[in-house]
Amino acid sequence: MAKEISSELLNTILTRVGGPGNIASCGNCMTRLRLGVHDSSLVDPDIKTLEGVKGVILTSDQVQVVFGPGKAHRAAKAMSELLGEAPVQDAAEIAAQNKRQLKARQTSGVQQFLAKFATIFTPLIPGFIAAGLLLGIATLIATVMHVTADAQGTLPDALNFMKVFSKGLFTFLVILVGYNAAQAFGGTGVNGAIIAALFLLGYNPTATTGYYAGFHDFFGLPIDPRGNIIGVLIAAWACARIECMVRRFMPDDLDMLLTSLITLLITATLAYLIIMPLGGWLFEGMSWLFMHLNSNPLGCAVLAGLFLIAVVFGVHQGFIPVYLALMDSQGFNSLFPILSMAGAGQVGAALALYWRAQPHSALRSQVRGAIIPGLLGVGEPLIYGVTLPRMKPFVTACLGGAAGGLFIGLIAWWGLPMGLNSAFGPSGLVALPLMTSAQGILPAMAVYAGGILVAWVSGFIFTTLFGCRNVNLD
């Protein structure tokens, strides 16, 4: 398919989802065009057969069309332009569609909630990947070249320059999250950013680092700015809800002057008194749970084995707050490489299908087109084009991923926990230089590479033995 998404393809998709009048919203994540629909019964599931479409996920109120990285953003932009030219519906049609949309929302509340995480974090993912890659490459060069932290010269300066982006991102990440979260929950982004900044300020007048807020208690009550990303998400949600309530009774002439002012005062009070302590407890509980799962080999196997299923249902974005919590508590994201084993297991399954298929079959052509993205960590083409339509290979791919997760869990259990140097990043082979551990980058890279190899081989063996029986290999 060409680099640009053809208007003919988008018009065909638009027709098969029920036309412009059936579209409630248009957006994208890293690999998918996401179309909110009023009536899912009007959607033709054969969209997945269109040339250039790598897969389709249907929910009660959304159609997710898999295009791949980069293409999804261009598709969403072009689709928005097409929808902007669509005729306006009359009030009766809009009312009827809103009723159907409300009903759909009531039947998929969990998916609707998790979809918010995609809205909040997807715009940040390119930055996570770029900063993480720069940090990983700089760390690898420093390790190989034996560059110490206090070294002087052109090379150390260049390496420090490459690392500064990661420091900047994670120092002020909560402000970006607060802005996006407030918007996602229906509020004003800058209000969420201001509230998030309260979690960054220091409240100890004797501290020598950070930014002192100017007071150390809240009307005599101690301030404990814990919770980080969890607290910020709760505070941003509260900020958006309060803003909506204030705006209901605020006269239009005073809206710009007073709505945000009142919203910030109320939300900040709640943040200092309730949200910061609550966020801290939730943050500690979540970190404890996943740190113990990560150090439990069986827990790692279960997480890796189920992750492909989470991707299929579109709820994998719900892990991002966990990634951020682990970054704060461990200094690296130990969950991400475990979940990445799911994609590696699928690569092994696809190679087994390729080996068992006829030389000139369509299956071999499908695998050839999807295997390189799979090796580089983009799994949707393999999921929706190769394994999931045949079901058994999808199950054996999950088992292969579980084997890779078990391997990483065993190594962590034996004393070498490792993880991604960023909250989010690429998976597959591209993620190798982003691995880190207390023992250094090279041992972490070796563990990750070993996990990928185990997942490849296990996925291949499981699929060869159990995933090809009574399966269409044409």
Swiss-Prot record:
Chief subcellular location: membrane
Catalytic activity of the protein: N-acetyl-beta-D-muramate(out) + N(pros)-phospho-L-histidyl-[protein] = N-acetyl-beta-D-muramate 6-phosphate(in) + L-histidyl-[protein]
Domain PTS EIIC type-1: 115-474
Record's subcellular location: Cell inner membrane
Membrane side Periplasmic: residue ranges: 145-157, 202-217, 282-301, 356-368, 415-440
EC number: 2.7.1.192
InterPro entries reported for this sequence: Glu_permease_IIB, PTrfase_EIIB_Cys, PTS_EIIC, PTS_EIIC_1, PTS_IIB_1, PTS_Sugar-Specific_Components
Record: active site: C29 (phosphocysteine intermediate)
Residue ranges, Cytoplasmic side: 1-123, 179-180, 239-260, 323-334, 390-393, 462-474
Membrane topology field: Multi-pass membrane protein
Residues spanning the membrane: 124-144, 158-178, 181-201, 218-238, 261-281, 302-322, 335-355, 369-389, 394-414, 441-461
A Pfam family the protein falls into: PTS_EIIC
Molecular function via GO: kinase activity; protein-N(PI)-phosphohistidine-sugar phosphotransferase activity; protein-phosphocysteine-N-acetylmuramate phosphotransferase system transporter activity
Cellular component terms per the entry's GO annotation: plasma membrane
GO biological process per UniProt: phosphoenolpyruvate-dependent sugar phosphotransferase system
Domain PTS EIIB type-1: residue ranges: 1-89
Keywords in alphabetical order: Cell inner membrane, Cell membrane, Kinase, Membrane, Phosphotransferase system, Sugar transport, Transferase, Transmembrane, Transmembrane helix, Transport
Role according to the record: The phosphoenolpyruvate-dependent sugar phosphotransferase system (sugar PTS), a major carbohydrate active transport system, catalyzes the phosphorylation of incoming sugar substrates concomitantly with their translocation across the cell membrane. This system is involved in N-acetylmuramic acid (MurNAc) transport, yielding cytoplasmic MurNAc-6-P. Is also able to take up anhydro-N-acetylmuramic acid (anhMurNAc), but cannot phosphorylate the carbon 6, probably because of the 1,6-anhydro ring.
Free-text comment about domains: The EIIB domain is phosphorylated by phospho-EIIA on a cysteinyl or histidyl residue, depending on the transported sugar. Then, it transfers the phosphoryl group to the sugar substrate concomitantly with the sugar uptake processed by the EIIC domain.
Protein name (Swiss-Prot/TrEMBL): PTS system N-acetylmuramic acid-specific EIIBC component
Species: Escherichia coli O6:H1 (strain CFT073 / ATCC 700928 / UPEC)
Taxonomic classification: Bacteria, Pseudomonadati, Pseudomonadota, Gammaproteobacteria, Enterobacterales
